[in-house]
Amino acid sequence: MKTKFVAVILGMALLGASSVACAQFGGLGSKLSGVTGGSSSNVSPEGIVTKYVGGAQNVNKADVKMLRAVGLKEEADRAELQAKNLTEGATQGSLEDATKVQTDSSKALQEKFASGKVEMDEKSKKQFADGMVDLAHGLLAYVGMSKEASGFKPAPTAIGSSSLSAAYVVKTLPDSIKSLGSTLKSSIDFAKTNNIPVPKEAADATSAI
């Protein structure tokens, strides 16, 4: 009888130890799963769109200031209107419009730089320099979120507006960074040629490209 009692006690002890071990390894499995899954498990489509819009707003502000500074008022007005229309809950269509305006603004600026026909007073030079700071901030925002965005993989069943917008951001972000980087470098060259002090933020941002 005593032997049976001891056997029961030992069996219960082993069962308890087994349960603890399973719980511990189960927790470890969850942790490993989180690691191997990367940051994508913590990335929401809404978060990606919100961060992208924040960067895009800086780029739009930069475009408005720099375009006006070099006398491109019509293009500046277009960029300003786009800035007002772009919100945190932007749809894919809104983001496509924003990308087009940014591309058109960059093209207009670079063509103006190349023309050599730019007259600027001290006020416009300061406005141009301020725009370079905004452009640097926008570019760094894009670069900063690029790694996070690259880890985003929408679920196969995700058909919501935010998921479509986030997928668009992931697809176009590398080209946007490349385009803005080129515009910033051209702006720095233009500033140096026209005796416009180059802001530290602009110079530093080029190293992040």
Name each model-derived stretch.
Residues 97-209:
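Extended amphipathic alpha-helical interaction segments
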Residues 24-92, 96, 205-209:
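Immediate post-signal-peptide N-terminus of mature secreted/exported proteins
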Residues 1-9:
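Bacterial N-terminal signal peptides that target proteins for export
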Residues 16-20:
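N-terminal signal peptide c-region/cleavage motif recognized by signal peptidases
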